[in-house]
């Protein structure tokens, strides 16, 4: 395709043609820069969704989004070993903040975490909401986040702060009211670019697409989708896992019950408003046992497993991760991580922003 125009791209999508990575990168660049009109954004998002996004198309969206992001610069050795524990959201299950709690557990186990998230969209309480309620400032800039990762072992990139260009798509997304490619970009566009992670996806078709994008850029990532629709490693049903590592993707169906984790129900994992979900975080870190702890442990185990080769027995890798995750909570390390994180964040905020 020569000089790109919206009519050309939209006509191609309506014919069912696949776009190139360069095509979708151009479109996303137009959106992020504020050059695209609302009709163009809506038409593009819906036409791409109706055709079905390919890994190459999603890669273009991700590439442009990261180019427009406020980047968090981490030392390469730290970035190479850091993880993200994150989900797409959108499963409409209204659970507690499992990935947020798992992030604290992973950091308590000694693995650096750079979490990327936002306020609630389809749920009652998003990552940003619960972290803010617990006392973490959300407005830290890239230097502040990097300092938290270095000194506390965990940092948080508030999506609204680090992807300002996405504000141009926000009104259209809200008016459309249906999932589009935009709903799956968050876990793929962490501005610190950690090389590993456990990523939940509620959409069965998009989960392998996301895994292919992670694989293509050389990341070590487990993409997770519960057979009950959760964008987590669920304890209420088996979980389909796409293991992306060394440029390849391997799919498996795993069950937390095979790890000795008791079967839960979705009701066991349900949260509420921000005060309710923050209380669940505190109770977990204080050592409370039960279905919420079980779900957090298995998701933390998934993130910890990405630090090792994923071409072997995934169940055994998760079993090892479970033990490390439990020790993180039971030793008090996860609780100390949260306290230290809040302390560092408030200390660096006036200096680094």
Swiss-Prot record:
GO BP annotations, alphabetical order: L-tryptophan biosynthetic process
- Write out the residues that bind anthranilate 2: 173
Amino-acid positions noted as binding Mg(2+) 2 in the UniProt annotation, renumbered to this chain: 231-232
UniProt cofactor note: Binds 2 magnesium ions per monomer.
Q: Does the keyword Metal-binding apply?
A: yes
Under which EC number(s) is this enzyme classified?
Answer: 2.4.2.18
Q: Which cofactor does it need?
A: Mg(2+)
Function noted in UniProt: Catalyzes the transfer of the phosphoribosyl group of 5-phosphorylribose-1-pyrophosphate (PRPP) to anthranilate to yield N-(5'-phosphoribosyl)-anthranilate (PRA).
| InterPro entries, sorted | Anthranilate_Pribosyl_Tfrase (IPR005940), Glycosyl_Trfase_fam3 (IPR000312), Glycosyl_Trfase_fam3_N_dom (IPR017459), Glycosyl_Trfase_fam3_N_dom_sf (IPR036320), Nuc_phospho_transferase (IPR035902)
Pathway-wise, it operates in: Amino-acid biosynthesis; L-tryptophan biosynthesis; L-tryptophan from chorismate: step 2/5
Question: What gene is this protein a product of?
Answer: trpD
Q: Which SUPFAM superfamilies match?
A: Nucleoside phosphorylase/phosphoribosyltransferase catalytic domain, Nucleoside phosphorylase/phosphoribosyltransferase N-terminal domain
Please report the name of this protein according to its UniProt entry: Anthranilate phosphoribosyltransferase
Assigned keywords, A-Z: Amino-acid biosynthesis, Aromatic amino acid biosynthesis, Glycosyltransferase, Magnesium, Metal-binding, Transferase, Tryptophan biosynthesis
Q: Whom does it interact with, and what assembly results?
A: Homodimer.
| Annotated organism of origin | Salinispora arenicola (strain CNS-205)
Task: Give a GO molecular function annotation for the protein.
Answer: anthranilate phosphoribosyltransferase activity
Q: What is the lineage of its organism?
A: Bacteria, Bacillati, Actinomycetota, Actinomycetes, Micromonosporales
- Establish whether keyword Magnesium is in the entry: yes
What span is annotated as the signal peptide, if there is one?
A: none
Q: Its domain of life?
A: Bacteria
The positions annotated for binding 5-phospho-alpha-D-ribose 1-diphosphate are: 87, 90-91, 95, 97-100, 115-123, 127
Catalytic activity line of the entry: N-(5-phospho-beta-D-ribosyl)anthranilate + diphosphate = 5-phospho-alpha-D-ribose 1-diphosphate + anthranilate
Chain positions recorded as anthranilate 1 binding sites: 87, 118
């Amino acid at each position: 395709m020569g000089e790109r125009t919206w009519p050309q791209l939209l006509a191609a999508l309506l014919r069912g043609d696949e776009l190139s990575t360069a095509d979708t990168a151009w479109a996303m660049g137009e959106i992020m820069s504020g050059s695209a009109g609302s009709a163009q954004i809506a038409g593009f998002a819906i036409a791409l969704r109706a055709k079905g996004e390919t890994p190459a198309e999603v890669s273009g969206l991700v590439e442009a989004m990261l180019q427009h992001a406020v980047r968090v610069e981490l030392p390469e050795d730290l970035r190479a070993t850091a993880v993200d524990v994150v989900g797409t959201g959108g499963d409409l299950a209204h659970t507690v903040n499992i990935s947020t709690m798992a992030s604290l557990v992973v950091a308590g186990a000694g693995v650096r975490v750079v979490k990327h998230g936002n306020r609630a969209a389809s749920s009652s309480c998003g990552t940003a909401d619960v972290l803010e309620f617990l006392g973490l400032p959300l407005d830290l800039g890239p230097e502040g986040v990097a300092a938290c990762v270095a000194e506390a072992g965990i940092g948080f990139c508030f999506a609204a702060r680090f992807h300002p260009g996405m504000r141009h798509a926000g009104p259209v997304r809200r008016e459309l009211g249906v999932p589009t490619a935009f709903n799956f970009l968050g876990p793929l566009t962490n501005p610190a670019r950690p090389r590993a992670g456990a990523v939940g996806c509620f959409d069965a078709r998009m989960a392998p697409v996301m895994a292919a994008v992670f694989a293509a850029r050389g990341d070590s990532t487990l993409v997770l989708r519960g057979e009950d629709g959760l964008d987590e490693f669920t304890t209420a049903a088996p979980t389909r896992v796409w293991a992306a590592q060394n440029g390849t993707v391997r799919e498996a169906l795993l069950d937390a019950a095979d790890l000795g984790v008791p079967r839960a129900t979705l009701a066991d994992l349900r949260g509420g408003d921000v005060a309710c979900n923050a209380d669940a975080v505190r109770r977990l870190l204080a050592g409370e046992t039960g279905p919420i702890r079980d779900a957090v442990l298995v998701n933390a185990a998934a993130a910890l497993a990405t630090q090792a080769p994923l071409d072997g027995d995934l169940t055994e890798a998760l079993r090892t991760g479970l033990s490390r995750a439990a020790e993180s909570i039971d030793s008090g390390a996860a609780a100390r991580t949260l306290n230290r994180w809040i302390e560092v964040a408030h200390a660096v905020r006036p200096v680094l922003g």
